[in-house]
């Protein structure tokens, strides 16, 4: 195990010992799963999204997670108010721009959030982050494997978005890439069955938020959150993949709840580029 992986591994105990309160303003498709993975990794979730209390809840939280999976005007207002309060209090903001590039409302909301709120970590898939970075991800190439193409695209896009926004960026996919614009880490953990369960990206963002609430190094926090989901996807497949996606879904949360430094250290495939 590399020294860097050892440093990331120790963050598991940090979250479980500190039990940070994580404020999630997320979508109604995955809100229950996001709350459960936050609990499973050792943090404490609160899912308040009403405009009359959202900023107050943020002010007593250790991190704010904003997810635009299901949008409405009132929730958008809550996101902006909470984000501003987090910035005022020095609380990290983790942003998941679900579907950015897909509709005018999502594009406008993404732009508004990025204009009005200082983001600590941006987590999305290659398409979403490419849109934000103003780049088109390459999908061509006959000699490279699909994973290699995705990795190369993700590295370029993650670095570009990180430089543009001045934050940590995590692009998740077949190969996960985390960058702050200068440093780059790839995570090779995960299983293709994760894509058959709705909300695994949202859950990953919630995990990143949980780590950001416990440690001030948001780059390492992002690496830890992404890796925990990847490892848990692998463990869940071994335990329940043959049973179908429902059992696999539950097994992911089970695996996160059992995650410790020994499991993480043994299975993590983290590479500094």
Swiss-Prot record:
Q: Which domain of life is it from?
A: Bacteria
Any one Pfam family here would be HK
**What are the UniProt keywords, alphabetically?**
ATP-binding, Kinase, Magnesium, Metal-binding, Nucleotide-binding, Thiamine biosynthesis, Transferase
Which cofactor does this sequence's record say it needs?
Mg(2+)
Q: Which residues bind substrate?
A: 47, 199
Sorted alphabetically, which InterPro entries does this protein's record hold? Hyethyz_kinase, Ribokinase-like
Any one of the GO BP annotations: thiamine diphosphate biosynthetic process
Which of this chain's residues are annotated to bind ATP? Answer: 123, 172
Q: Which reaction does it catalyse?
A: 5-(2-hydroxyethyl)-4-methylthiazole + ATP = 4-methyl-5-(2-phosphooxyethyl)-thiazole + ADP + H(+)
Pathway given for this chain reads: Cofactor biosynthesis; thiamine diphosphate biosynthesis; 4-methyl-5-(2-phosphoethyl)-thiazole from 5-(2-hydroxyethyl)-4-methylthiazole: step 1/1
Instruction: Please name the GO terms that the record assigns under molecular function.
Output: ATP binding; hydroxyethylthiazole kinase activity; magnesium ion binding
| Keyword Cytoplasm part of the UniProt annotation | no
Under which EC number(s) is this enzyme classified?
2.7.1.50
Q: Which family does it belong to?
A: Belongs to the Thz kinase family.
Function in brief: Catalyzes the phosphorylation of the hydroxyl group of 4-methyl-5-beta-hydroxyethylthiazole (THZ).
Protein name per Swiss-Prot or TrEMBL: Hydroxyethylthiazole kinase
Q: Which gene encodes it?
A: thiM
